[in-house]
A protein has these predicted regions:
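An N-terminal, well-structured beta->alpha segment
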Residues: 2-13, 18-109, 113-114, 139, ...
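Proline/glycine-rich low-complexity loops and linkers
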Residues: 128, 172-208, 300-373, 380-381
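Buried hydrophobic positions in well-ordered alpha/beta secondary-structure cores of metabolic enzymes
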Residues: 53, 92, 129, 142, ...
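Short glycine-rich phosphate-binding loop at a beta-alpha junction
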Residues: 85-95, 119, 224-226, 328-333, ...
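N-terminal small/polar loop signature for handling phosphorylated ligands or for N-terminal nucleophile
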Residues: 78-82, 86-153, 240-298
Length: 497
């Protein structure tokens, strides 16, 4: 892409800052029976269809069917319109998956059957829907995406009128309504049946919003940026945002065909981005996932920089400038112990939550914090956006590089000294309560005592599949690998008991 420039706009506090809303429930720090030294709150309440980030599964296979989507559309419209004297307006955005058309039409049908108005945004990033829900004063926003999953999966996640993801309690109410249609009352008839319309400039509105989060006194002129949009929702918006701020942009993953989203590209597969950064001698590489709510960055040396490192470097600068609220960073139980120690050295602290960016956001809102995220790359700059936004996070990293006049590799090395961390995924036939897995529980207690204050053990179920995740941290990687193998073997024994 040719280098372009545009007039820099002064950030608009009204459009860049989400509307204030009532605080969400307190954050959850241990998930699905997780065993974690840093656990600070009970696990999220189990629901039938909703997981850690909405409903997700293989498209056209239960639960991710058009039949369920139709029922969900009806339930959302009922809740969004409750107590209002107007037909609820509900936005629908999606990523580039082939199955998105099917799910979109089913949701729209359910909404219209309840008298709701549907605004179709087309393929846009998840954070674009969150922003548009507030800027257009909609009653809800729906995103059809399975994020980083392969193309044959899909999912549905929901934002309230305030631009924030729904809490567990609201999702539980939707499930109850979906399972008992009598609770929804009569369907709309005649002229009260809803209608659907397209929002033609949804991408343009988001591009303007994203650019407003970049400091008006800085310019990306002369900065070389490689963007990998994963053939996903940001395939048009992300390159445009950086180019219009002056960067020389090279674009990867911008030719979606319905089945190539996340395929060997994007945040999960940064190898191609690394090669292109080195080839172009770029200053930074930015890899997004399918719905562009997270990013992984690559420095000028071709080294991958994850969410923990980005949070550490941004927190350090914000503390120095007096901008980090209460000198506190919010992250999940999966973030490296080194991040905790880095915050302590800065005179700050780290608050941990359950896995899932919405639990991070809930903790930020209830605690009055403004920076948080996940190791996986969901980064929330609450002064700018109400949810994780890979494009905006990339802009904040670029602003940090320009402010400090330091290369990304230097910033990352200075900010975070990692503790060795091992992640082991164990596929099992079905989920069982962790407390019922006696061999695993007994060994977990021994391992926790062995690690002491020098390490951590976290054992939790995946939020979307029967996969046990074991995370170990400590000073000796070889010891961690041996312990991880022993724990995995214990879990397999329990699974067959």
């Amino acid at each position: 892409m040719a280098k372009t420039t545009s007039k820099k706009q002064k950030p608009s506090k009204t459009s860049a800052t989400p509307k204030k809303a009532a605080p969400s429930p307190a954050p959850k720090a241990a998930q699905n029976g997780a065993t974690a030294k840093a656990a600070e709150a009970p696990a999220p309440r189990a629901r039938k269809w909703f997981g850690t980030d909405g409903i997700r599964g293989m498209a056209n296979v239960a639960p991710m069917t058009p039949e369920l989507a139709l029922q969900l559309g009806r339930a959302i419209t009922f809740v969004a319109g409750r107590g209002k004297n107007h037909a609820p307006r509900i936005l629908i955005g999606k990523d580039t998956r082939l199955s998105g058309y099917m799910i979109e039409q089913a949701l729209a049908s359910g909404i219209c059957s309840m008298g709701g108005r549907v605004i179709l945004c087309g393929p846009v990033p998840t954070p674009a829907v969150a922003h548009l829900a507030t800027s257009m004063r909609a009653d809800a926003g729906i995103v059809i995406s399975a994020s980083y999953n392969p193309f044959d999966d899909n999912g549905i996640k929901i934002f309230g009128a305030d631009g924030f993801k729904l809490p567990d309690e609201a999702e539980a109410e939707l499930e109850a309504l979906m399972q008992d249609e009598r609770l929804l009352g009569p369907r709309a008839t005649g002229e009260n049946i809803g209608r659907a319309e397209k929002l033609e400039d949804s991408r343009g509105r988001y591009v303007v919003f994203a650019k407003q989060t970049f400091p008006s006194d800085l310019s990306l002129d002369g900065i070389k940026v490689v963007v990998d949009a994963a053939h996903g929702a940001a395939y048009r918006t992300a390159p445009l945002v950086y180019a219009e701020l002056g960067a020389a942009v090279t674009s990867l993953g911008v030719k979606p065909n319905g089945v190539n989203i996340n395929a060997g590209c994007g945040a999960l597969h940064p190898e191609g981005l690394v090669a292109e950064v080195l080839k172009r001698k770029a200053d930074i590489g930015i890899a997004l996932d399918g719905d562009a709510d997270r990013l992984i960055v690559v420095d000028e040396k071709g080294q991958v920089v994850d969410g923990d490192a980005v949070m550490a470097m941004c927190a350090a600068r914000m503390i120095k400038d007096g901008e980090l609220a209460k000198k506190t960073l919010v992250a999940t139980v999966m973030s490296n112990l080194g991040l905790e120690r880095a915050m302590a050295r800065l005179g700050g602290k780290l608050v941990r939550t359950a896995v899932g960016d919405r639990y991070v956001v809930e903790a930020m809102r209830s605690g009055g914090y403004n920076l948080g995220g996940e190791q996986s790359g969901h980064l929330i700059f609450l002064d700018h956006a109400s949810t994780g936004d890979g494009t905006i996070a990339g802009l904040q990293v670029l602003a940090l590089m320009l402010r400090t006049r330091k290369a990304l590799s230097v910033l990352a090395a200075d900010a975070l000294e990692r503790v060795p961390q091992i992640l082991e995924n164990v596929n099992l036939p079905k989920k069982k309560p962790l407390e019922s897995m006696s061999a695993l529980s007994a060994l977990s207690d021994k391992v926790t005592k062995k690690l002491g204050d020098d390490g951590r053990l976290l054992v939790r179920w995946s939020g979307t599949e029967p996969k046990l995740r074991i995370m170990l941290e400590g000073p000796d990687e070889a010891v961690l690998r041996s312990l991880a193998k022993d724990l995995a073997d214990a879990a397999r024994r329990d699974a067959t008991a």
